[in-house]
Every structure is written in structure tokens, then in C-alpha cells.
UniProtKB/Swiss-Prot annotation:
InterPro entries: C4_dicarb_transport, Na-dicarboxylate_symporter, Na-dicarboxylate_symporter_CS, Na:dicarbo_symporter_sf. The chain crosses the membrane at residues 13-33, 49-69, 81-101, 149-169, 189-209, 227-247, 302-322, 336-356, 357-377. Belongs to the dicarboxylate/amino acid:cation symporter (DAACS) (TC 2.A.23) family. This is C4-dicarboxylate transport protein. It comes from the Bacteria. It comes from Leptothrix cholodnii (strain ATCC 51168 / LMG 8142 / SP-6). HAMAP family: C4_dicarb_transport. Its main location: membrane. PROSITE patterns: NA_DICARBOXYL_SYMP_1 (PS00713), NA_DICARBOXYL_SYMP_2 (PS00714). It is a multi-pass membrane protein. Keywords: Cell inner membrane, Cell membrane, Membrane, Symport, Transmembrane, Transmembrane helix, Transport. NCBIfam families: PRK01663.1, PRK13027.1.
Length: 447
């Protein structure tokens, strides 16, 4: 068993290293923009390393969690409650964005003529102009082949196969012990790889931040500062208001939870992608006391169905464009937009820029709001992406704990212990989390 060492010197903590990397990245991008822009491969490389490991981690976590369960009805109950939570909370996020943008009206008075906007930069996003139907979305969850799902890193497809594999392995009972043990030990190896990758997280955060500041510049924020400020403030209201109340109602503090995942939040701030910390979040949530099967089902599903920050962004950005271009939107039109976004927001993945792509597709399909207005926010979208990703990450973490409590899959004593006393060793060595949890992991029940 891996025994965590004592507290690390502050300069060796991931928290300190990522903060330092982000600050250096901002300075480099601001004072030497060409050099900062050239750092883009560092950020891209880090995210690719993480994406490389996501599919097998989801597979191992879900299979071991489901195959080790005694009552298979719990899987269906967990999935159903998770989807119910996702739908309710993401709808609240959409409504909050719609409410705030109508109250603050950040686009009123800009009087932008859509015909004068340069739409070359958004052509790639608006060309398709077609949304998936519900049937197409459901069919897209079924992979053409299992290899294709893993090769492309399609989370929902991998999740579907993993659930089916876990059910099938459970049916074998004791005969499946050898396969179960192999997959369970493989998960240890995969999280050890995550530990290696996280050693270069500061380099990835530095490269991504240097590129963002170097390419777009801090000056690009000034003309649209009101929209930026309104969006960031709305995300804070959602996190500490909506999610804070949900957390309090379920026996934990949103402040302590944010402190517990502070390293993950900093990595997301640097990379603008909540997907970059998915493996670490799964390990941290298991360590917090949520059952492995619940973490394996809720977290990957939440990355498609519970993107709270993206939901806030979509309604705010759409109405902002209408306000800025003097395009009137009646209450009926706004409610129609809301209804469409209830569907299209579920198709955004936790990767950089996905929110802008969904917004472009939605405006192209719905009509009423000039699609050319997307050019207004293209320059600041990367900066808004950071707030989206942070809100998405916190929202999915809270969702996992809440669903775990609803289903009885949360060890509240363990949760309180870790929220009150988080150690640097746990934060920096995700593979050690599995050593702590899996020593009591059950084998498939004999049938």
C-alpha cells in the first residue's frame, strides 16, 4: 500500500506551481505576445495527454464499480436520479443567465450594425447551422465499433459500453473474478499515469495562458468589459447561491468543497478546459466518500448533461447579441430560445470552445438573432471559457456528491473528514487515492 508522505514544501505543491505558471504565462503573453502565442503547443500537448487517458479510466472505474455491486437496481436508480438532477440544475442555470442579462442589459446602447461585422472568423462555426434531433443524439451515443468509441474519446459511447461490460461481468459472478481483478489493477496503473502527467500541469497551464493573452491581449477585454463582468458575476451567483444552497441542504459547505478541489480549479483556469482534470476529479470524489460506481456514472455523464457554466453563457450571449444589434426579442422568443437551448446545451463537451460552437449552431437554426453578431464575442470567448469551465467543474462535483447522498452511496463521515482536513499528499498523488479506497473493494458477487 502506498503511504502518503508528510506535507510538501510549498514550492513543490501543485497549487503553488500552477499559480506561478499562470502568472508567468500572463506576463509573457502581455509583454511578448508573439512569443506567448508560440507557447500554444504546450497547452495543447497537456490537454492531449489527459484526453489520452480519459476513456480507459472511465471504462475501468465504471466496470469495477458496477461489477462489484450486489444490487444491480442501484445502477438504474443512480442514473435516473443523476439525469433528473442535471435537467433541473442546468435549467436553473439557463434561467439565471436569461434573468441577469435582461436585468443588466450589457448590450444595450452599442447599436452595432450586423452588416458591418467581419464574419470571416466565425464562418467555420456557422457553416453547419444544423442541430441534432433527439433521435440523432441518442443514436450518436451508440458507437459504430467499440474501438471507434475509444479511439475518438467519445465519453457517452465509452460510458455506454462500460455499463454494459460491467453488467455482463457481474452476471459471471465468481467466474469473472480474474477479469475483475485485472481491470481493477489496471485502474491503479492508469491513475499512476495521471500522476505522471500532472507533473507537467504547470507547463500546460503556462502555455495555454501565454497563448490566450498573446493572441487576444488584455486590451480585447475593454470594449466588452460589461458583458465579461456580468457573466463572471452571474457564475459566482450560481456557484455560491444556487450550488451553495444545494450543498448546504445536503450537509456540506461549498466553500470547503472548492478548497478541496483548488488544484483542479487552477489547472482548469490555466487550460480553459474542465476535461483536463476529469481523471483527478474522479479520484478526489472517490476519496471524498462517494462510491466508485456512482462517480463512474455521474461524472462522465455530467460532462455532457450538466454544464452549468455553459448554460449560463448560452442564454446570456444570445440575448447580448440581440441587445447589441438592436434586435428586439419578445418574451415568447426568449422562451423559445430557452427551450431549444435545453436540448442543444446537452451536446457541449467539457473542452475549450465547445460553448461557442453550440451557440453558433443554435442561433443558426433558431433564427431571429443575427448570427453575424457572434463576431462581437469571438475575441473574448476564450476569456469567458475559463469561467464556463470552472463553473462546469464545480457543478459536476456538487452533483456527484448530491446524487451519492440520494442513493446512499456517500460516506458522510469520510466526506466531513476530508473537507475539514485536506492534505497536500492527497491533492498531489491521485494514484494514492485508489490505494486507500480499493483495498476494501468487493469482487463480483457469486451467483
Amino acid at each position: 500500500m502506498h503511504t502518503p508522505s508528510g506535507p510538501l514544501p510549498f514550492y513543490r505543491s501543485l497549487y503553488f506551481q500552477v499559480i506561478t505558471a499562470i502568472v508567468i504565462g500572463v506576463l509573457l503573453g502581455h509583454y511578448w505576445p508573439e512569443t506567448g502565442t508560440a507557447m500554444k503547443p504546450l497547452g495543447d500537448g497537456f490537454i492531449k495527454l489527459i484526453k489520452m487517458i480519459i476513456a480507459p479510466i472511465i471504462f475501468c472505474t465504471v466496470v469495477v464499480g458496477i461489477a462489484g455491486m450486489e444490487d444491480m437496481k442501484r445502477v438504474g436508480k443512480t442514473g435516473g436520479l443523476a439525469l433528473l438532477y442535471f435537467e433541473v440544475v442546468s435549467t436553473l442555470a439557463l434561467l439565471l443567465g436569461l434573468l441577469i442579462v435582461n436585468l443588466v442589459q450589457p448590450g444595450v446602447g452599442m447599436h452595432v450594425d450586423p452588416a458591418t461585422l467581419d464574419t470571416k472568423g466565425i464562418a467555420a462555426y456557422t457553416a453547419p447551422g444544423k442541430m441534432q434531433t433527439t433521435t440523432e443524439f441518442l443514436l450518436a451515443v451508440i458507437p459504430t465499433t467499440v474501438v471507434d468509441a475509444f479511439a475518438k474519446g467519445e465519453m457517452l459511447q465509452v460510458l455506454l459500453f462500460s455499463v454494459m461490460f460491467g453488467f455482463a461481468l457481474h452476471q459471471f459472478g465468481g467466474r469473472g473474478t480474474l477479469v475483475f481483478d485485472f481491470i481493477e489493477k489496471t485502474s491503479h496503473v492508469l491513475f499512476a499515469i495521471v500522476g505522471f502527467i500532472m507533473k507537467v500541469a504547470p507547463i500546460g497551464a503556462f502555455g495555454a495562458m501565454a497563448f490566450t493573452i498573446g493572441k487576444y491581449g488584455l486590451g480585447s477585454l475593454i470594449p466588452l468589459a460589461k458583458l465579461m463582468g456580468t457573466f463572471y458575476a452571474t457564475c459566482l451567483v450560481f456557484i455560491f447561491g444556487v450550488l451553495g444552497l444545494i450543498a448546504k441542504a445536503h450537509g456540506f459547505s461549498i466553500w470547503k468543497f472548492i478548497k478541496y478541489i483548488k488544484e483542479e480549479l487552477l489547472i482548469v483556469l490555466g487550460t480553459s478546459s474542465s476535461e483536463s482534470v476529469l481523471p483527478r476529479m474522479m479520484a478526489k470524489l472517490e476519496n471524498l466518500g462517494v462510491r466508485k460506481s456512482t462517480v463512474g456514472l455521474v461524472v462522465p455523464t455530467g460532462y455532457s448533461f450538466n454544464l452549468d457554466g455553459t448554460s449560463i453563457y448560452l442564454t446570456m450571449a444570445a440575448v447580448f447579441i440581440a441587445q447589441a444589434t438592436d434586435t428586439p426579442m419578445t418574451l415568447t422568443q426568449q422562451l423559445t430560445l430557452l427551450a431549444v437551448l435545453l436540448l442543444t446545451s446537452k451536446g457541449a463537451a467539457g473542452v475549450t470552445g465547445s460553448g461557442f460552437i453550440v451557440l453558433a449552431a443554435t442561433l443558426s437554426a433558431v433564427g431571429g438573432v443575427p448570427v453575424a453578431g457572434l463576431a462581437l464575442i469571438l475575441g473574448i470567448d476564450r476569456f469567458m471559457s475559463e469561467a464556463r469551465a470552472l463553473t462546469n467543474l464545480i457543478g459536476n462535483g456538487v452533483a456527484t456528491v448530491v446524487v451519492g447522498k440520494w442513493t446512499g452511496d456517500l460516506d458522510e463521515k469520510q466526506m466531513r473528514y476530508h473537507l475539514d482536513r485536506e492534505t497536500e499528499a492527497e491533492a498531489n498523488e491521485p494514484e494514492a487515492v485508489l490505494d486507500e479506497i480499493d483495498q476494501h473493494m468487493p469482487v463480483p458477487a457469486a451467483r
